[in-house]
């Protein structure tokens, strides 16, 4: 196993492997907020996110949605197909919350009849600004056809995830996706899907079961991530 680091982000490290086109992802215990301004470490967080992402990506594969995920290889690591990440954060919103509620002057918790799909330019120095299709084309981030593919994939993923989280008695408020191009130019779902990248509320109590407990100092991060993993395991069995 090689330890040549390819990339290090806020929550993960990517390493080369002996197999061409395959990378090893190591999940970190770090949690960040405010685009990295606030940072803390939580023992076991990397393991939780690796397990949650592995289960969710496997579930999506069973539903016919392809991703870069190959398999988990340890408590904190997984193998993935190497892709060139498209610098877009694709946010799917089912319920008013967070920045969207502030931007539109709406109350948190208001249901959105048809899910909203948004694009944000992935650039920490610019604080990941909200952009539209014309910006994407101007920046040469993706073509019109690729944006259509990404939007369609995001809506398909949303449908599958809503059904999954409903079984877990959790409301999928919103979530962030990233996509990449493989060696053949095919667009694949990439990155992770975990409480780091989703807003999740308990259906009965509206308890927040995601990174908002860290952002807002309203709970124990590892406790709520463990709760999500336990519910996920229950519906997967």
From Swiss-Prot:
Pathway annotation: Purine metabolism; IMP biosynthesis via de novo pathway; 5-amino-1-(5-phospho-D-ribosyl)imidazole-4-carboxamide from 5-amino-1-(5-phospho-D-ribosyl)imidazole-4-carboxylate: step 1/2
GO molecular function, one term: ATP binding
GO biological process: 'de novo' IMP biosynthetic process; cobalamin biosynthetic process
Catalytic activity, as annotated: 5-amino-1-(5-phospho-D-ribosyl)imidazole-4-carboxylate + L-aspartate + ATP = (2S)-2-[5-amino-1-(5-phospho-beta-D-ribosyl)imidazole-4-carboxamido]succinate + ADP + phosphate + 2 H(+)
Name of a matching Pfam family: SAICAR_synt
Gene3D superfamilies xrefs: ATP-grasp fold, B domain, Phosphorylase Kinase, domain 1
EC number(s) recorded for this UniProt protein: 6.3.2.6
Protein keywords: ATP-binding, Ligase, Nucleotide-binding, Purine biosynthesis
NCBIfam families attached to this UniProt entry: purC
Family: Belongs to the SAICAR synthetase family.
Protein name: Phosphoribosylaminoimidazole-succinocarboxamide synthase
Gene it is expressed from: purC
């Amino acid at each position: 196993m090689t330890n040549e680091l390819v990339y290090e982000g806020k929550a993960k490290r990517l390493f080369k492997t002996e197999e061409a086109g395959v990378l090893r992802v190591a999940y970190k215990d770090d949690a960040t907020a405010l685009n990295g301004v606030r940072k803390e470490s939580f023992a076991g967080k990397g393991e939780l996110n690796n397990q949650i992402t592995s289960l969710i990506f496997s579930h999506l594969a069973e539903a016919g949605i392809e991703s870069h995920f190959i398999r988990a290889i340890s408590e904190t690591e997984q193998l993935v197909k190497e892709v060139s990440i498209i610098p877009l954060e694709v946010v799917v919103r089912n319920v008013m919350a967070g920045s969207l509620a502030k931007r539109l002057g709406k109350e948190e918790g208001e249901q959105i009849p048809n899910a909203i799909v948004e694009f944000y330019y992935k650039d920490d120095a610019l604080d990941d600004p909200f952009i539209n299709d014309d910006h994407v084309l101007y920046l040469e981030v993706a073509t019109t056809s690729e944006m259509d593919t990404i939007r369609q994939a995001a809506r398909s993923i949303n449908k599958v995830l809503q059904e999954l989280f409903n079984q877990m008695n959790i409301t999928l408020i919103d979530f962030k996706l990233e996509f990449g191009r493989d060696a053949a130019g095919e667009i694949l779902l990439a990155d992770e899907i975990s409480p780091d990248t989703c807003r999740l509320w308990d259906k009965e109590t509206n308890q927040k079961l995601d990174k908002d407990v860290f952002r807002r100092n309203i709970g124990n991060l590892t406790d709520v991530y463990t709760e999500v993993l336990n519910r996920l395991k229950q519906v997967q069995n």
